From Swiss-Prot:
InterPro entries in UniProt: SmpB (IPR023620), SsrA-bd_prot (IPR000037), SsrA-bd_prot_CS (IPR020081)
Family named by the database record: Belongs to the SmpB family.
Biological source species: Leuconostoc mesenteroides subsp. mesenteroides (strain ATCC 8293 / DSM 20343 / BCRC 11652 / CCM 1803 / JCM 6124 / NCDO 523 / NBRC 100496 / NCIMB 8023 / NCTC 12954 / NRRL B-1118 / 37Y)
Compartments it resides in: Cytoplasm
PROSITE patterns, per the entry: SSRP
Protein name: SsrA-binding protein
Entry annotated with the keyword RNA-binding: yes
Signal peptide stretch: none
Principal localisation: cytoplasm
Function of the protein: Required for rescue of stalled ribosomes mediated by trans-translation. Binds to transfer-messenger RNA (tmRNA), required for stable association of tmRNA with ribosomes. tmRNA and SmpB together mimic tRNA shape, replacing the anticodon stem-loop with SmpB. tmRNA is encoded by the ssrA gene; the 2 termini fold to resemble tRNA(Ala) and it encodes a 'tag peptide', a short internal open reading frame. During trans-translation Ala-aminoacylated tmRNA acts like a tRNA, entering the A-site of stalled ribosomes, displacing the stalled mRNA.
Keywords for the protein's UniProt record, in alphabetical order: Cytoplasm, RNA-binding
Cellular component terms per the entry's GO annotation: cytosol
GO biological process, one term: trans-translation
Keyword NAD: no
Length: 154
């Protein structure tokens, strides 16, 4: 009998600052519409999502300000590294995202980029911007957890 492959979460890019700067309420998994040279660059890990965000325009979810480096062997087929890319979501998911962004202070941010069954996927989250004191509370909690883990380790 064939062995099942283990589900190892292998992230190509992760937006660590997103959970620090935003309170993430809900997440969605979306496909990304990429060209051939772009997917090769993504598989090589040449993607930066730190400054990225998602906009809804004419019923389409668009990933903006995400940098995918040019593929080295791609020459004439390379495209603009910062071009806007379409996210592949169901219509009801797009409606939920569009309704959420109608509120003041709510944005859609990419959290992680990973491969799933050979396809590039992005995990996007609906986030509300945190205040400075909320960020300080998060830092205090994190420091307390580290201190507890050190005590239990020794």
């Amino acid at each position: 009998m064939a062995k099942k492959k283990q589900n190892t979460e292998n992230y190509l890019a992760q937006n660590r600052k997103a959970r620090f700067n935003y309170a993430i309420a809900e997440t969605f998994e979306a496909g990304i519409s990429l060209t051939g040279t772009e997917i090769k660059s993504v598989r090589a890990g040449q993607i930066t999502i730190g400054d990225g965000f998602v906009t809804i325009h004419n019923g389409n979810a668009l990933l903006t300000n995400v940098h995918i480096s040019s593929y080295v062997q791609g020459n004439q087929f390379n495209v603009d590294p910062l071009r806007t890319r379409q996210l592949l979501l169901h219509k009801r998911e797009i409606r939920v995202l569009e309704k959420a962004t109608q509120e003041q202070g709510v944005t859609i941010v990419p959290l992680k980029v990973y491969l799933k069954h050979g396809f590039a996927k992005v995990l996007v989250g609906i986030g509300r911007g945190k205040k400075k004191y909320d960020k300080r509370e998060d830092i205090k909690k994190r420091d307390q957890e580290r201190e507890l883990s050190r005590r239990f380790k020794n």
